[in-house]
Amino acid sequence: MGSFPSTLTNVPSYWPKAEFSLFVLGQILSISCYFFVAYHIIFEKSARKALHNHVIIILLFYNFLGVTFDLSLTLDRDRVGYVSLFSPTLCRFWQLVDNGIWYGGISLMMWASFERHILVFHSNFVRTTRQLVLVHYIPLIFFSLYAPLLYFYLIFLYPCDEDFDSTSLLCGGMCFYATIPNWFLVYDSFVDYTIPILLIVVFSISLLLRFIRQKQRLQQAVTWRQCRKMTIQLTLVSTTYLIFDLPYVIIFLVQSCGYPNFASNIIQPYVASLTYVPAIVLPYATLLALPRLKQKLCRLFFWKRHQRQIVPLTTYT
């Protein structure tokens, strides 16, 4: 993920402090929204059992780790110039969340974009228990754990000489980069990040177009409302990734095609730090797709007071 540089000459003097303040404010507000959304998805039986919410629950958990753990350490390091709670164990877990959990969230979003086609237009594929296991649960588990387990091995188990730096973001680079074959670095850049982001674009846009095209074919009102909710939810959530991750992918692809200096003056101070934004925005995108949102917000901010009859004390003589 990105960083908050303050020494680059092409950055206005006010920008690092402004960016820092915006991220702190966004983090505080986002955490509150995470709790609100998680409560209404996890503790409402109908929402918790809905297949399309399973991937959303894991996405919320992964991105919550990014907002509370990864972003907090990044902001603290940027504020004081070093990692306050520096220790090798902390550094390893920081690297795991920043890479394994982050890539895991992107893989999950890619699967969610594809699975939503099945849930909206081919719901007969997930009617039996066997179909649920093969089509829903196995892919969900795979895309949830693939990147976190891969980076757990690379960070905690891969044999290399660790040299943590308390003044650097993520305590310095991960040591496996120095010895791992170059093909893996190419694989990691494309398979774990670039291709999933591009597939999110394809699957999300095609879902929206299919929904608009087949809108008239959906005869039952119940089916129509359910399909609309699932499409809106996926569109809102995927948009948070596309707006803030797609620019980074486009710049990476152009640089990989023989233009290494393309946008190099903006990618580090501006574009790289945008990769933190989806984790901040995700709960709001999920919130907008919650059923009966207006009623939930009204209960939160304007709950009714129960009328109580007050009987005055009367003294009898």
Which stretches of residues belong to each language-model region?
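Extracellular N-terminal segment of 7TM GPCRs
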Residues: M1-F36
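Class A GPCR helix-loop hinge within the 7TM core
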Residues: W102-I138, L290
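Seventh transmembrane helix
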Residues: V237-S238, L242-L253, P269-L313, T317
